[in-house]
Each structure stands twice: as structure tokens, then as C-alpha cells.
């Protein structure tokens, strides 16, 4: 075969693989399934591909969804639900079985990126004591399966773990959560895994109307709103994220990266919830996360929008929980949004 042809083919293949791998700032989408009117998993994954959504977060494993993801080249964050924490923490064989069933059986065709062990586990939850042991057992199972270089194990927290968040440099964890956060941080540092953070400027804004400006929450403020020398903050997203980084730095986690595993703006059910505000927030977010925060400028922020669809069976209150979808159940977009 002509060596020049081989060289050209190699170059083309190299370009193909470079162009189909998501960058750090490529925004993914959360795929929740609490609805009785949603498209099938196969239709949904086809929608992801059509819209160039290259990463997905799943809150629990589902064989139909995982089968639909085979060969899609979409990177997957797979959730281990809170209800599994005790059994997985108490038995390495249970952890091994979970990884075999939901990861190994699909690993040849599905690009697993993270396993989120638990989601927003509260210190008051009866299963909180099992969180870190479950993370450790799942990590051992991943390593035993030979996937340690491919899949990072972490957990998802929300901003409620912070005692202070204003100004961002004052960010610190609540004293009562440290019994769980300290071992989480030690584990993540030892594994070079990121912390997954569910971050909603909407809830901060809606809970403090009159104190937090809407344009600050939507990335539309014309100039800096919060001064935190030597930094200035023009949007609430950066301020919240840097507050979490500040808390990590004070607790042995200065080396950790944060993945924003959920964010978005609802289109109904609450204060200033409408299609226009959701369009503004999500489109501005997609552009913004390529640039980093004042504390970590130039560092792309891996981020996941919540969510692909409205979910009419989400437990309420608050009623706003039902209205976070980017698309209607008929797969039509609520508003223009560009993932390219």
C-alpha cells in the first residue's frame, strides 16, 4: 500500500478522533426519567447525537438506556442510587456484582466516565454512614475489572454542605458535614477524582429575591457585582463555584477539580421561571464554561445541564421540579440551544 496513502489515512483518523472527543468545556445533559410520557431510550440517545450532546448523566442504571448508548461515543456519568449505598458498602461482592452488571457488561461499547456513588446524601440521612465505604468498594470493583484508568469514582453534593459562601473566598464547609466530607475529600485526592457538584443559581436567586439580582444569576450583569479582592464576580455561577473551591482548599482538597454535575433554569412552577430566562441562562452557560472562574481563570468547567426533558412524575413540592427540560416529550426544543 502507498505509504503516502497510509500517512494521509493516519492523519484523517487522528483528526476524526480529536474532533469526536469532548473537550473539558463541552456541556453534557442530565437524563432523568421520572415521567410517564417520555420518549424511549433509543429515541433519546438519537436526540443526544442529533444535537451534538456528547456527555450524559444517568441517575441510575437502566439496561435499555445502556443498550441505547452502545456505539454512540457519548461519555456517561452513571449514578449508583442512595438506596444501594448500604448493601454496596457492606459487601465487596455486592459492589463487584453492581459493576459487573451495569458497567462491565457494557464497557466494550459504552464510554463510562464517572460513577457517582450517591447523590446529595445529607448528613441526617440514615445511609450517610455508608457513603464513603460504598465509594471505596465500587472503586475496588472498578480496579478489579481493569477499568481504573477509564472510570473515576466520586459522589455528588449540593451547595447545602457549605456554612459560608459569601464572598467566595470565605467559602467553608459546615462543621456537622465534615464527618462525611473529610473522608470524601481524602478519597478523591487519593484517586485524583473530581468532586461532582449540583449547582443552581436559580434556587439561590429564588430564595433571596431582592438581595440577588436576576441579571447576576443569568450571566447578563454588565459589570462586576460582588467584590472579593483581588477578584470581582460578574455572575452568581462563578461565585458559587469558587466558594466551593475555597471550602475544598481549607479542607485538604486544594488539588481537586469540580465537575458541575447539574445546573440549569426551570421554565415553570416558580419565581421568574419561564422559557426566556431558561434560554438566556443555558445558552450563556454553554459559552461561559469555556473560560473558567475568577479563582481558576482559563480552566474549562465540565458541566451538565439539567435536564433533557420535563419530568411530570417528579415528587413535589417544590412544583418547579417538574419543569427543567430542554425538550418537550415530543422531542421538540423549548427554545434554541446550541451544543456545537
Swiss-Prot record:
Residues 1-25 form the signal peptide. GO terms for molecular function: glucan endo-1,3-beta-D-glucosidase activity. It is an enzyme of class 3 (hydrolase). GO terms for biological process: carbohydrate metabolic process; defense response. InterPro entries: Glyco_hydro_17 (IPR000490), Glyco_hydro_17_plant (IPR044965), Glycoside_hydrolase_SF (IPR017853). It comes from the Eukaryota. Gene3D superfamilies: Glycosidases (3.20.20.80). It catalyses: Hydrolysis of (1->3)-beta-D-glucosidic linkages in (1->3)-beta-D-glucans. The keyword Signal applies. The active site is at residues 120, 262. One of its GO terms (cellular component) is extracellular region. It is found in: Secreted. Its EC number is 3.2.1.39. Belongs to the glycosyl hydrolase 17 family. May play a role in plant defense against pathogens. This is Probable glucan endo-1,3-beta-glucosidase BG1. It comes from Arabidopsis thaliana (Mouse-ear cress).
